[in-house]
Structures are given as C-alpha cells and as structure tokens.
Amino acid sequence: MRTIDIENVNVAAFDTMPTPEEIHARLPISAKATKTVTHGRGLLRKILERKDHRLFVVVGPCSIHDPVAGLDYARRLKALADEVGDTLQIIMRVYFEKPRTTVGWKGYINDPFMDDSFRVDIGMEKARQFLLDVAELG
C-alpha cells in the first residue's frame, strides 16, 4: 500500500518569525525616544485627569505605506504641535494595517514592499524602526 503525502503539499517554504525580544535587540529604543514616550503619556494622563487645561488631538494617516512620507508628516506635525502647544497637545496616530480591507494590500507589516511578498518578518522590523524614528523627533 502506497502512502500519499498530504501534509504541507502546497507550502513552498517555512520562514521563522523574529520574536519581539529579537526585534527589540536589533532595534533598541534610545533614551530620547523613551523620554518622548514617557513624557507624552504623562501629559495625556494630566489632560485626562483635568490637571492640564489643554485638549489633546490625535491625528495621522490611515495606514503608513511610505515611511519617508510618514516621517515627513511627523516632522511637519511636530512643528505644528510646538506652535499650538499652549492650547493643544497633538499626538500622531500611527497605524500600519488596513483592518477593513478585504481585498488588496493589507498593510505595511503584512506586505512592506507592496508587492505581495508578505515579508511580515521585515514588516515588523520596518514598523518598529518607523515608530522609533517618530519618537526620536521628540
């Protein structure tokens, strides 16, 4: 009797995904980025607790697909935030996926090259690098 191999017959390859620890080790957060995040969280807490008179405004692109354009947006938003900081606390929304998309491109993490290569491993690293770059702006 001949055994028919039916397991993984349509799988071309297996790639190992990096763990969060591996990504953090390759792309550690700097002291400046840590300060940005910590300071921002503290400000939001004060605003929500009404210990700060400002309003906070969350703005940003629907989904990051071009990190160069996204970082340009972040720089411009930072300049605006500095300008209106006495009345508003502006926070950049950064989202990498297309949660309501059922066809087509699913997002930067799933397909960072927008070529259906689905290099999620690279997408996770590129997404973290983008967040670190934005946090470095202060």
Question: Which stretches of residues belong to each language-model region?
Answer:
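N-terminal beta-rich core of secreted/periplasmic extracellular enzymes
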Residues: 33-46, 78-91, 97, 127
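Conserved, mostly hydrophobic/aromatic
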Residues: 60
